[in-house]
Amino acid sequence: MSEFELTVGTIKDLDLLVEHRLLMWKDIYPELKASIEESRQITRSWIESKILEGSLVPFIVKTIDELIAGSGCILVKEDQPRPGSDQIRFPYLLSMYTVPEYRRKGVASIIVTAAIRWSRQNNFDRISLHASKEGFPLYEKFGFVQTNEMRLKLDP
């Protein structure tokens, strides 16, 4: 028996999902802590709207004692048609966060496994994500490969 249990989150988990998303950003960009905190309300509104419209599927991992160990979400996004696939919607894995005391104990793997299973059950042909430096080895273990996305930051 595993020491963890996976559940699919609901709107009732909104506070947790917001907190975990902000903690994820603070882990990745500690120097931006103040501006990350300033984004709390817009993050809350965004997560709430995506759950209510059905495009955000949260996965929450708890210990057998009901303590929160981590969370992550699938966001179903729309893309342009592309050769080799007739799908214009695809799952995007985001907001992966594991509570520090449960890191390296398989929590993130439980979430990734659930996201892959959910995506297959819903007949998607791919999953995309952006990996942090720390998360890269985990995703490679599951067969994710790096793509050629580039980004240009525009000044306002």
Question: Where does each model-flagged region fall?
Answer:
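Conserved catalytic-core motifs of GNAT/GCN5-like acyltransferases
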Residues: V76-R82, S128-E134, E140, V145-P156
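A short helix-loop-beta-strand connector motif used in the catalytic cores of GNAT acetyltransferases and
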Residues: S45-I60
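A short beta-loop-alpha structural element at the N-terminal edge
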Residues: E5-E19
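Conserved acetyl-CoA pyrophosphate-binding loop and the N-cap/start of the following alpha-helix
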Residues: Y102, G106-A114
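Conserved GNAT acetyl-CoA-binding A-motif
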Residues: V112, S119-A131
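Conserved GNAT-fold acetyl-CoA-binding loop/helix
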Residues: W25-W46
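Conserved acetyl-CoA binding element of GNAT-fold acetyltransferases
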Residues: G84-P100, L152
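Conserved beta-strand in the GNAT
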Residues: I60, L67-V76, Y92, Y97
